[in-house]
Regions:
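Structural detector of well-ordered beta-strand residues that form the stable sheet scaffold
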Residues: 3, 28-30, 60, 108, ...
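C-terminal glycine/acidic-rich active-site capping loop/insertion
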Residues: 156-232, 236, 258, 264-267
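Aromatic/hydrophobic pocket-lining residues that form π-stacking "cages" and hydrophobic walls in ligand
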Residues: 16-18, 44, 247-248
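Beta-strand-loop-alpha-helix segment that lines the small-molecule cofactor/substrate pocket
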Residues: 1-36, 51
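Active-site beta-strand termini and strand-to-loop segments that position acidic
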Residues: 125-132, 152-154
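C-terminal hydrophobic helical "lid"/dimerization subdomain
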Residues: 239-252
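Predominantly a Rossmann-like dinucleotide-binding segment in NAD(P)-dependent oxidoreductases
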Residues: 28, 35-116, 255
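Glycine-rich phosphate/pyrophosphate-binding beta-alpha loops
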Residues: 89, 116, 138-146
Length: 267
């Protein structure tokens, strides 16, 4: 039985060949998707599934730092370097775990080369889901001020995790109509459109951080070895993540949106 380091392989064809051998030998093969146990991710997954925000139309997931790529394999293309392989594979897997009930229609990706010409040291990846939901996955290594770790918007509210160590802030709309909107005064004039809402029309709440144990990944794998439960990260899920990685590279290469023939990820 084998647990591979992420991203698992550097191509879908290579992954398929490994899966074929594993099946022929009757052995388990999976990838170490330890970020499925990140608490910030688990909170946003809970918010989406609860429906508290109404029909969700936007999800943003980011990791940003300011130290560039570490001076090891991550800087070399032949060894699977670059942030899309290193962090992208985790954040893609998380996004598909959050938006579990929609198909991807197309994707667009732009890679960044701020400090490294050989591999990407950052990227912006947009996943366009059916029903008008747009998801942005972004990683940067030259950012000295970070944007929120997670940001989710729906027709009835917004949820935010500012930092991976924080709780989730949720603001929902209690009453859409306001009788008297107080305009914001700027140096260039007044605006009511972007004026903050009256506290009487919104509710604010906080979702506490749940308990999580990354060792559950290994506990699952040992039980799967004994035939007691299916492995947590399935072959289908590994293929799906890598399909998106390959499509992202192709999108950046061609400079255009790539249509994506998709299937449901599975809740």
């Amino acid at each position: 039985h084998v647990i591979s380091e992420k991203p698992v392989t550097l191509s879908l064809n290579e992954l398929d060949s490994v899966i074929k051998v594993a099946d022929e030998c009757g052995k388990l093969f999976t990838v170490h998707q330890n970020r499925r146990f990140d608490v910030d991710y688990l909170m946003m997954k809970q918010v989406y599934a609860s429906g508290v925000l109404g029909d969700v139309f936007g999800v943003e997931s980011r990791y940003q730092g300011s130290r560039g790529i570490p001076g090891d394999w991550r800087g070399h293309k032949e060894h699977g370097g670059g942030m899309l392989y290193d962090w992208g594979i985790h954040l893609i897997d998380q996004m598909l775990g959050i938006v579990y009930d929609r198909k991807i229609e197309s994707i667009f990706c732009r890679l960044e080369h701020i400090t490294n010409d050989e591999v990407d040291d950052g990227f912006k990846l947009d996943l366009y889901f059916e029903g008008g939901l747009d998801a942005r996955i972004e990683v940067g290594t030259s950012h000295f001020i970070s944007l929120p770790r997670f940001y989710m918007t729906g027709r009835r509210g917004t949820a935010e995790v500012n930092d991976w160590r924080d709780r989730t802030r949720i603001v929902t709309c209690r009453e859409w109509h306001e009788d008297d909107v107080k305009p914001v005064v700027t140096s260039a004039g007044l605006t009511k459109t972007m004026a903050p809402r009256d506290e009487k029309t919104v509710d604010e709440s906080w979702l506490d951080r749940p308990e999580s144990d990354g060792h559950d990944f290994y506990r699952n794998f040992t039980r799967a070895m004994d035939g007691k439960e299916p492995q947590l990260v399935s072959h289908e899920q590994m293929r799906r993540d890598l399909e998106i990685i390959e499509a992202a590279f192709e999108s950046d290469k061609q400079g255009r949106i790539i249509p994506f023939d998709d299937c449901h990820f599975g809740k």
